[in-house]
Amino acid sequence: MELFELTLHELHDKLAKREVSSVEATRALLARIEATDSRVNAYITVTPDEALAAAEAADRRIAAGGLTPLTGVPVALKDIFVTRGIRTTCGSKILGNFIPPYDGTVVAKLREAGAVIVGKLNQDEFAMGSSGESSAFGATKNPWNLACIPGGSSSGSAAAIAARSATATLGTDTGGSIRQPASHCGCVGLRPTYGRVSRYGVIAYASSLDQVGPVTRDVTDCALMLGAVAGHDPLDSTSIDLPVPDYAAALTGQVKGLRLGLPKEYYLEGLDPDVKRALDAAIETYRGLGAEFVEVSLPHTDYAVATYYLIATAEASSNLARYDGVRFGHRAAGAANLIDMFRRSRAEGFGAEVKRRIMIGTYALSSGYYDAYYLKAQKVRTLIMQDFMKAFEQVDALLTPVAPTPAFKIGEKVDDPLQMYLSDIFTIPVNLAGTCAISVPAGMSAAGLPIGLQLIGRPFGEETILRAAHAFEQATEWHRHTAQL
Amino acid sequence: MNYQAVIGLEVHVQLKTDTKIFCGCSTTFGASPNSQTCPVCLGMPGVLPVLNKKVVEFAIRAGLATNCRIAPRSVFARKNYFYPDLPKGYQISQYELPICQNGHLDIEVDGQVKRIGITRIHMEEDAGKLVHADVPGLGSGSGVDLNRACTPLLEIVSEPDIRSADEAVAYLRKLHQIVVYLGICDGNMEEGSFRCDANVSVMPVGSTTFGTRTETKNVNSFRFVKQAIEHEIERQIELIEEGGKVVQETRLFDPNTGETRSMRGKEEAHDYRYFPDPDLVPLVISNDWVEDTRLSLPELPDARRSRYRSELGLSDYDAEVLTATREMAEYFENCLAAGAPAKGAANWVMGEVTRALNEAGKDIAECPVAPARLTALLQLIEKGTISGKIAKTVFDEMWQSDKAPEAIVEEKGLVQVSDTGAIEKIIDEIMAANMGQVEEFRGGKEKVFGFFVGQVMRASKGKANPAVVNELLMKKLKG
Ligand SMILES: [Zn+2]
């Protein structure tokens, strides 16, 4: 087995036994990136020099007995994470030349743990998109079929795992941006509860919905990554001051007596047959493991997509105002005056999807429309949260599809934004409710594309969904399938 | 037709916290450009604000001192607009749910007490500033200095209860005095620590419908506020009399001409697209916090003034002067605490102490004569050890040196002479030397009395007790 094929915990074991050094693992990963990324385009920036220096430091640390689960492990980060001294673009031309002067909290935690950052991953511009096509650095391809999208917006985070060009990655999930690409690429992707992981140093798309989470090869890796980045941060007022559980210890394999809810609004008539088949099989697997199923209702599900696109775009229109060409990033040449400079810098720097969402958000917040759109959306959001809280009175977690279909063809939905927005229909309600959910591989389509299933947990119920996902993983072989590149 | 002005004021108070409202950067004024910045106040991608608790504490103080209700739950909002010195493209402020509401201040104009309502007080961050032309290293461009960005401000908004420029100034002076008293603002108007926007409209006397208002921005002295409002009232009346219409707009005051001029019209008015800032959780303030703060408030000028009148028996004027600043009042009260008589201390603080401070260009906080020393001096006068006149000499010496008044009196032999025998001897000598004047006095020219007093005092080098001198002199002259 090649070094780049190892999971995080397998590599950790080898590092612990000194069978391999971090420098060897890092070199293997860098070579794998070199060999695959011209086809996959999972990376925007690769940082071999910094990575090898970090790997050497990790080896010294391991020799000194300072090994933690992430020490010496090559990881890659969505280019939404601010990295000191390393170009951070957020997939946008407007930040194409931006080199941040600071590390965000999650990055600092990874560095402290001794992880080796090998590069920054491709993504939809400012995390706006469901297909990985709206990056200023070109579309990311699905390693299972290079003609297909990998999902988005954390397209590079999932594609790099599927291409085995990163051992573990971090993404962000605002409306499904971790779970949906993880599902399309056959990875494990976790969106933690809002407030579980610090957002300090994560370039904001929609502040009240964004959350950092891991994309990994299996559930154990996912638990280890979450444990490394979770926790209260005094630099993020919205982060919650709760102790971080030992997530890996929660993976007991036991789901006997676990009550899983099937929200009837998620099992639509028109669900893709491959997705439906995978879910039915998953339900049978869980039954075999002793889990119980209860039908539940989330009555406001129909309004989730519309609500999401009002709240997310409203916040985005404000969060993206700082990209005005004044202090950093792209500035248009030859502007006639100040307003012209703002206008042209933004017109040149932002892509079509970002502009579309800024326009929607600006409209939703403007006087005369605020009550009808933004405020109404906030009220519906509260109803959606209440739906979940009611469901969690009956069950420990919900089992649902991740995406309505397997990955579609690149270019297929580019001209139909509304159709594209519906691809997040099963993931978005989780973000509105602020709770946690995981996507795990649960099948393959007839066309040979991965299909994931989603387990939605109650707020701060990460241990439960990790345990359930892990038990499923142990009972099935889906996570062992590998994309051929 | 007669017109009535309607005025509302929005006052921006820069808070005297050590660090900024949403980051740990220093708020010191006058540092080199952009030296007091970090990723947060620079609005870098990925940063998040964290609220400075001290700012909340100061806002509660201001609210309590102006009789406001402190909201148990308040919310920060984003005010969205584009400007080069606004790093995030929005300003974090409070909007729908501010920290303080429904307060009031009583002002006094021409002996009449009037209550001015305070609509709200909210917390917000300041923007940076633009530096135009000749920026070091930039040549003739424009530079952005973000040292001031994220500096904490309170915006105190009055009801449109003010009816004249004089009332406006009285209200502002009072507010200024309070925030300085509270220790939450340095009150430095030239540096912009206390600045005001004036909303002015006029309507016919007796009308209940307000006219169209204009807003004059950033006036930073009491005199300019008076000028700006008076000019604006006059301008609006003239405009209406000529058949014109006042347009709602933002205006600037030009201190050189004493006039206001249009800055931007309503057609350019912003839609700020306020919405609750998702990066800051709602601010919850416990009742205990409010009550603890209430207990920690200093006695405010109004209460102090009335106490000086009723308990110390001081005149309105004295009470007013002594409470003008918290430092002045504290100096005075430290004298009382050391055992000084109220009236004597009042006279000396308002007289010699103030004169000496003015001459030295010093603040009372820097007064070299400590209250206890001044009190010791006053006690020497009371006991008759020295005369009031000699005391001034002693005071000047105390100002220069670090000596106690007793030591100075002893060293220079300034002890007052009250011994009647010694004084009688001097009087006899002077009368003998000035028989002509004695005759004049006895002939009814009583003015000459003063001449004799002066001569005796001079002969005693000022040490003779004036009361004794007067008494003996009168007796002897009358024969
Ligand atoms: Zn700062």
Swiss-Prot record, chain A:
GO biological-process terms attached to the record: translation
Keywords: ATP-binding, Ligase, Nucleotide-binding, Protein biosynthesis
Xref: InterPro entries: Amidase (IPR000120), Amidase_CS (IPR020556), Amidase_dom (IPR023631), AS_sf (IPR036928), GatA (IPR004412)
A GO CC term attached to the entry: glutamyl-tRNA(Gln) amidotransferase complex
EC number: 6.3.5.7
UniProt-annotated catalytic positions: 78, 153, 177
Gene Ontology terms for molecular function: ATP binding; glutaminyl-tRNA synthase (glutamine-hydrolyzing) activity
Phosphoprotein found in the keyword field: no
Cystine residue pairs: none
PROSITE patterns documented for this protein: AMIDASES
Catalytic activity: L-glutamyl-tRNA(Gln) + L-glutamine + ATP + H2O = L-glutaminyl-tRNA(Gln) + L-glutamate + ADP + phosphate + H(+)
EC supergroup of this enzyme: ligase
Protein family per UniProt: Belongs to the amidase family. GatA subfamily.
NCBIfam families documented for this protein: gatA
Reported function: Allows the formation of correctly charged Gln-tRNA(Gln) through the transamidation of misacylated Glu-tRNA(Gln) in organisms which lack glutaminyl-tRNA synthetase. The reaction takes place in the presence of glutamine and ATP through an activated gamma-phospho-Glu-tRNA(Gln).
Subunit field text: Heterotrimer of A, B and C subunits.
Protein known as: Glutamyl-tRNA(Gln) amidotransferase subunit A
Organism field: Geobacter sulfurreducens (strain ATCC 51573 / DSM 12127 / PCA)
UniProtKB/Swiss-Prot annotation, chain B:
Record key words, sorted: ATP-binding, Ligase, Nucleotide-binding, Protein biosynthesis
A Pfam short name: GatB_N
InterPro entries reported for this sequence: Asn/Gln-tRNA_amidoTrfase_suB/E, Asn/Gln-tRNA_Trfase_suB/E_cat, Asn/Gln_amidotransferase, Asn/Gln_tRNA_amidoTrase-B-like, GatB, GatB_C_1, GatB_Yqey_C_2, Gln-tRNA_amidoTrfase_suB_CS
GO molecular function: asparaginyl-tRNA synthase (glutamine-hydrolyzing) activity; ATP binding; glutaminyl-tRNA synthase (glutamine-hydrolyzing) activity
EC class (word): ligase
Record keyword Nucleotide-binding present: yes
Record-listed E.C. numbers: 6.3.5.-
Protein origin, superkingdom: Bacteria
Keyword ATP-binding found: yes
Annotated GO biological process: glutaminyl-tRNAGln biosynthesis via transamidation; translation
Catalytic activity of the protein: L-glutamyl-tRNA(Gln) + L-glutamine + ATP + H2O = L-glutaminyl-tRNA(Gln) + L-glutamate + ADP + phosphate + H(+); L-aspartyl-tRNA(Asn) + L-glutamine + ATP + H2O = L-asparaginyl-tRNA(Asn) + L-glutamate + ADP + phosphate + 2 H(+)
Role, per record: Allows the formation of correctly charged Asn-tRNA(Asn) or Gln-tRNA(Gln) through the transamidation of misacylated Asp-tRNA(Asn) or Glu-tRNA(Gln) in organisms which lack either or both of asparaginyl-tRNA or glutaminyl-tRNA synthetases. The reaction takes place in the presence of glutamine and ATP through an activated phospho-Asp-tRNA(Asn) or phospho-Glu-tRNA(Gln).
PANTHER family: GLUTAMYL-TRNA GLN AMIDOTRANSFERASE SUBUNIT B MITOCHONDRIAL AND PROKARYOTIC PET112-RELATED (PTHR11659), GLUTAMYL-TRNA(GLN) AMIDOTRANSFERASE SUBUNIT B, MITOCHONDRIAL (PTHR11659:SF0)
Similarity annotation: Belongs to the GatB/GatE family. GatB subfamily.
Oligomeric and partner information: Heterotrimer of A, B and C subunits.
Name this polypeptide is given: Aspartyl/glutamyl-tRNA(Asn/Gln) amidotransferase subunit B
Source species: Geobacter sulfurreducens (strain ATCC 51573 / DSM 12127 / PCA)
